[in-house]
């Protein structure tokens, strides 16, 4: 799963990386949690790629209770084409979710107890971004307001991530962006082939402070490397 991530750096660099025609202003964030407003990238019909701020936590268009969104932060790539909550969005409403890095928690046995050690995962290119495969949905509230929401598609961990957690976000390569974003592309079979673990060489990992477990902790210190007693990479 992916329950926290970060997005920071000059907006000009993000616009260049994703070839955006327009993008709303956003602020650097180092501990983005579900139910936050997050930046996604879409490719509307007849236009170029655009950035849009939406809520993280998918509310399917048919949902009676918007509270379902709190449970739909992630969509397993293996079943995204068939699960009722996701299959419509997968076929017709896909997006990219840009990230400077993400967090995963490793279960560590210590003194007869199990604690969770967070790790920060960032692109091997220090100026790069990850592009998470994402889904979108628009839900109309009883008062007529339309709420647009998103979720992150996940996949099995690659070799680098496996010692930390069994799941990770599905990260797309630049040459896959257009097919994933194309609103006219309904070939779910071909789309499913894009969902898989990216190569370990594309990322770096480092342990960070458990302080990020709190959703109100924010700032560059969130991604600073800390010392740990034992590491699965030693």
For each of these PLM feature ranges, what is it?
Residues 1-234:
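Short linear sequence motif anchored by a di-proline
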